[in-house]
Swiss-Prot record:
Signal peptide: none annotated. This is NAD-dependent protein deacetylase sirtuin-2. NAD(+) binds at residues 48-52, 58-60, 130-133, 225-226, 249-251, 287. Residues 339-352 have a biased composition (Basic and acidic residues). Inhibited by Sirtinol, A3 and M15 small molecules. Inhibited by nicotinamide. Inhibited by a macrocyclic peptide inhibitor S2iL5. Inhibited by EP300-induced acetylation. The gene is SIRT2. The active site is at 150 (proton acceptor). GO terms for biological process: cell division; cellular response to caloric restriction; cellular response to epinephrine stimulus; cellular response to hypoxia; cellular response to oxidative stress; epigenetic regulation of gene expression; lipid catabolic process; myelination in peripheral nervous system. SUPFAM superfamilies: DHS-like NAD/FAD-binding domain.
Length: 352
């Protein structure tokens, strides 16, 4: 009954003009909103586009995207490299690719450090990331700040359901760079980084955090994602209708038919251009440049540039001294099987 009442109410309001939530639908309008008392909790939704300036390819860009450059692995089709059934039979292509993309070879970008500033200023409610490169962690976001929707290289587990032995980042790194297929020390089954493959469950944390976070968000900041992968893409519709949404991306994303989206329970998508637009802003270009532009409007530009410079210098110093990340040296341990309420990935879901 509540669904029907809500559906009827939304249907009647489709043609009504909502009051704008920003004084203008521009980056400047978003900046002024962020400086007001109304903006206290920001959720970031991020994808591969925030890491490309670090040298990590995205998945879909023509010629330079990951899926256009997998010929050397002789896969039956590009997506097979992230299919759990193919991985269990032929793990070598994935681990060869993992060596090229392994965390620790790249530095966080301006986008990552902009989110760090949001955290330091007490504005970051949560970062939901599709990325598996752990750059958010390297930039200073902590476990509590993150929802790694498509998993992470940070930990790995034995694929045997009866074992599930856990291994730290340092253990997996040694195996990958030695070009040794990682095998469990207990049962000799394959060990896989905790990234979400086709046919695997999303982390339960994705759903538990989503249910509470989006009830209290004041601003949704979407960066570097095509918003094509479900259920991550549906997160933009979880924000209340009274919450502004800013997209920083090379092209517009997340737009959909409002009536169809409402019927399917996935909201109306982004509306940047219609006469009824009232809360959505798109800044088109490189994500780093978008964050710099926003930081300048907020009066944070020098602080952001200094943070990037200081943190990159620290990473370089640690690399030169061979200092390991202390958070990657934990001992292997057992983990319980995944929770039963974790949802399965769809065919379109893939690490991004």
């Amino acid at each position: 009954m509540d669904f029907l009442r809500n559906l009827f109410s939304q249907t009647l309001s489709l043609g009504s003009q909502k009051e704008r939530l920003l004084d203008e639908l521009t980056l400047e309008g978003v900046a002024r909103y962020m400086q007001s008392e109304r903006c206290r909790r920001v959720i970031c939704l991020v994808g591969a586009g925030i890491s490309t300036s670090a040298g990590i390819p995205d998945f879909r860009s023509p010629s330079t995207g990951l899926y256009d450059n997998l010929e050397k692995y002789h896969l039956p089709y590009p997506e097979a490299i992230f299919e759990i059934s193919y991985f269990k039979k032929h793990p070598e292509p994935f681990f060869a690719l993992a060596k090229e993309l392994y965390p620790g070879q790249f530095k966080p970008t301006i986008c990552h450090y902009f989110m760090r500033l949001l955290k330091d200023k007490g504005l970051l409610l949560r970062c939901y990331t599709q990325n598996i490169d752990t750059l958010e962690r390297i930039a200073g976001l902590e476990q509590e700040d993150l929802v790694e929707a498509h998993g992470t290289f940070y930990t790995s587990h034995c694929v045997s359901a009866s074992c599930r032995h856990e291994y730290p980042l340092s253990w997996m790194k040694e195996k990958i760079f030695s070009e040794v297929t990682p095998k469990c020390e207990d049962c000799q089954s394959l060990v896989k980084p905790d990234i979400v493959f086709f046919g695997e469950s999303l982390p339960a944390r994705f759903f538990s955090c989503m249910q509470s976070d989006f009830l209290k968000v004041d601003l949704l900041l979407v960066m570097g994602t095509s918003l094509q992968v479900q259920p991550f893409a549906s997160l933009i519709s979880k924000a209340p209708l009274s919450t502004p949404r800013l997209l920083i991306n090379k092209e517009k994303a997340g737009q959909s038919d409002p009536f169809l989206g409402m019927i399917m329970g996935l909201g109306g998508g982004m509306d940047f251009d219609s006469k009824k637009a009232y809360r959505d802003v798109a800044w088109l270009g490189e994500c780093d440049q978008g964050c710099l532009a926003l930081a300048e409007l907020l009066g944070w530009k020098k602080e952001l540039e200094d943070l990037v410079r200081r943190e990159h210098a620290s990473i370089d110093a640690q690399s030169g001294a061979g200092v390991p990340n202390p958070s990657t040296s934990a001992s292997p341990k057992k983990s319980p099987p995944p929770a039963k309420d974790e949802a399965r990935t769809t065919e379109r879901e893939k690490p991004q």
